[in-house]
Amino acid sequence: MRASIPSLLFRCKRSGRLTLMALALLGQARATELPLFLGAPLPAVTSNMAHVACLPPTDPLELAVWRVTTAGGRPDLSCGNAFVEYQRLPRSSSAPVDAFDQIAAQIREAKSEVLLASMEWHAGEGRPGWTVALAVRDLYARVQANPAAYPQGMSVRLMLGNFPDLQRADWATLPLALVRDLRTLGVPLQDAGVGWSLSVLNYRYFPHSHVKLHVIDGRDLTVAGFNFTDTHLPLNERNGGLHDLHDLGLRMTGPVAQDGVAAFDDLWRHSRQVRCPGDVRPEQVGAACTLGDPDRITHPAAATEAVTTGTARAFMLHRRPGVDQADRAHLSLLGAATTQIDLMQATFSPLLTCWYAYLNPDECTYDTLPVYLRAVVDAIGRGVRVRVLMVDYGIDTAANRSGAALVRLMARQLGKEELFEARYTTFAMHTKALAVDGRMVLAGSMNFHFSAWGSLGLAEAALATSDLAAVQQQKASFEDVWANGSRPVPREWWMRNVASGSAATPADLPVSRLSHP
């Protein structure tokens, strides 16, 4: 549904999205399509669902997330999974093969289907998007050389997030740049002779999609926080001040990958697809290609099977406007914590009106906090230790400082300030990961930022698992950064005037005079 500019402003003022909306107003009217009345996402359509039998989990953390992901009778694909690896950026001595090269290797080895979604995309030789384009070229060459090895053909679906675009009225600059790279490398969109089908899509709504995930053959799922952008590369002439940006993706195999397919399909259903003449040359892409309705959703038969690969529990979480599953799962997991929460969150911020609360916190009381910060305060109130790693540069500087200040304030009011610790990383970080009680880890695209939550928040994805190796590896990474790559967030001067223990529980914390006259 489309909406007028005045109505957009009204909605955005009410929801606290005015900053985001300003970007949309710079575009043409036809690019400001709102995601209204989309309906619920469809569940995974798994061809062998009758053979997938997951018993309800007994671990309280698993159970907290499971109750959300299976609500409403949605299929349970949480059992029989296996942790593969974390895909990390940037390249380093501990990660000599970076996530971009790992993903390229996965694409080259695909047997029937590649699904990949990213918000932002930097195309052109030597850039992360080019790494993917080269892998798709190599995959096409393999299919072309030996079609018999791919009896169900090869389907490649690449989806971008409709990131705000000031160059074209249809916001198609990034997907068309991706198509241009593919055509430069000689990759066709269709080659029926060998069963090759390549689609490039762009999410159609504002707010945009922030989802970063890829699924290979319906069996191998990675959910990540990084875009295919130069900021994750070493310093070069393109990335200027922001470079070597740290981030990660969590890779699992097993039935949970089918939930990843369902999340991708939900975005596909709400996207536009690039349409080009069959013989379009690279230099013609911008003028000759257009965006239209997407093809009907189909998958190779082999990519619709849920295949058991291990014994781990894993939970695919997804959200977009009108769908709050990932919100509820995050809150349920945090609400089940009993001992410790470790947050590696680039953003840890309150609502926009409280971004400068570090100067004066009086109007930013417990009841004005966004739900994710309230969940953190509630955990502290239960006696849970909370540690947070965040950044202190760019637009997040004041917001994160205020988020830490407000949580510390309320922890002191609860008489439990010692349970909250916050540190700034000494490097550029884009990570969105958390660990709970040393038994479950979650990673993905979802920031502790108002834009990622609520009825008009971005489309997001996350993956959670209780696999011991996954939990231990993230714990080791967190502890290393905590000890060697961070510095304390200082207490604000006014904290000396805050009495300790003035509230017995979060329910006893002060509330806003404006909302409670």
Regions found by a protein language model. Give the residues of each.
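Charged, low-complexity intrinsically disordered terminal segments
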Residues: 32-517
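N-terminal secretory signal peptides that target proteins for export/translocation
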Residues: 1-12
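Non-Sec secretion/translocation targeting segments of pathogen effectors
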Residues: 1, 29-32
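Bacterial N-terminal signal peptides
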Residues: 16-27
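Residue-level detector of transmembrane insertion/anchoring sites
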Residues: 3, 18-20, 202, 422
